Amino acid sequence: MKKKLIFGVLFIVLLVGGYVAWQVFGPTVSAPESKYFYIKTGTGYNDVRQSLIDQKIISSTYFFDLLSKQLKYAGKVKAGRYQVKNGTSLLSLLRMLRSGNQAPVNLVINKLRLKEDLAQKIAANFECDSASVMDVLNDAETLKRFNVNNNTLMTIVVPNTYSMLWNASAEKIINKLYSEKEKFWNTERVNKAKALNLTPEQVYTMASIVEEETNKEPDKGLIASVYMNRINTGIKLQADPTVKFAMKNFGLKRIKHVHLSYDSPFNTYQHAGLPPGPICTPSTKTIDAVLNAPQTNYIYFVAKPDWSGLSNFCQSYEEHLVNAKNYQHFLDSVGIK
């Protein structure tokens, strides 16, 4: 009888011990394959625990509280973006949260036009809001430190994928972009810009126009050569994308004569030389296409009268008129007004 009692007690102890071990070390964390759990800055322990319950990552707070007490997590909550994998143990989950071992955010920047676009892009991916980003972008000290003004500010943004922590401050994110911009403009690129009698900011601005003119790599260098020839001979760039930017009418499909007189320093039909700043964030390929533009005699270009996206280039105005007329007929034929 005594032996049965002892075996019974041992069985219960083992059963309870096994259950506790399963709850702590077993794959009890639930997530649809893999999800991200966000802890905002200033969030307390109770809110973290409730969020884990609400999101069905944990099913009970008892063992979470018990283990949190042992790990002294309650007073060490760290904001961040955490990757929770299905089947993770409660111990692993708590260790990750306690250590602040975040999953970084990959901020993918392609083509943006305005600093407001940049602010919204950052706010959509990070804890900081667009207002705090705009505060940094509009700050006089920021502009001075980056040696830019309101028009050239976006030249600090080189399209790429940037890996940063979700709870990084707006200032830290912008500083990261500027740091990468400085790395991009290495000695070789700076020297190529000097050879063109342009600053890196001017190269970037020209590249932004080229970026808006075409997405065809073979044409980018040729278009840049046209702009260089026009600048060097004192001819206005007369670039249609600058009119769209000046008007902030990015959906405009066809530039008409009435649009050309729009009063803005960005309208290169009205003002000679490059606009005072970029009209978008050009790709690194486009920037390099400008830096490596071939030497040509081309002064004019216009899209080919088809859907190829390529352009016809020429030196004489007479030939350009023929090319332009053909393209206008094409637009009329496909109903683009």
Where are these regions (language model features)?
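Bacterial extracytoplasmic/cell-wall-associated proteins, especially those involved in peptidoglycan
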Residues: G44, V108, E127-C128, T142-K337
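Signal peptide-directed extracytoplasmic domains
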Residues: Y19-W185
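Hydrophobic membrane-insertion alpha-helices, especially the h-region
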Residues: F7-Y19
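Positively charged n-region of N-terminal signal peptides that target proteins for export
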Residues: M1-K4
